């Protein structure tokens, strides 16, 4: 499958994203169905690509695939909410605020435990990096560097810092 105009995104991924966002936005309500032929015609894709779309959405709990019926939308409570694609789709839907809230709550539950474990288990060399990251992030925040550059620098450091904590926690699920 070739990429498309969406930055090299696979066609089947673009179709999955579109259909998932429609479900999340309530445009394709739970319980309603689309045939594979509907998907093919709407997106101008082959039956093979439409089947891959169906398999992908089904693997994430977004649809049930039924013979002679097609793809039946499922309620969000059935979806694989921790799947990175599902999270991304929600962030691009009308569910964005709810997804951000859920992610914040998850971080508040996990990060203190990860930090406590990292404080116990990390080497002295790794522990010495923690205040360095904090100082660098504070410096960027206090510099009031405007625009995307300042935000990008802060975000990159924040991701590195939290990745280090999670990795050093000793819990492979973090």
Regions found by a protein language model. Give the residues of each.
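Short linear motifs at protein or domain termini
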Residues: 1-110, 116, 120
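Conserved amphipathic alpha-helical segments that form helical-bundle/coiled-coil interaction surfaces
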Residues: 103-174
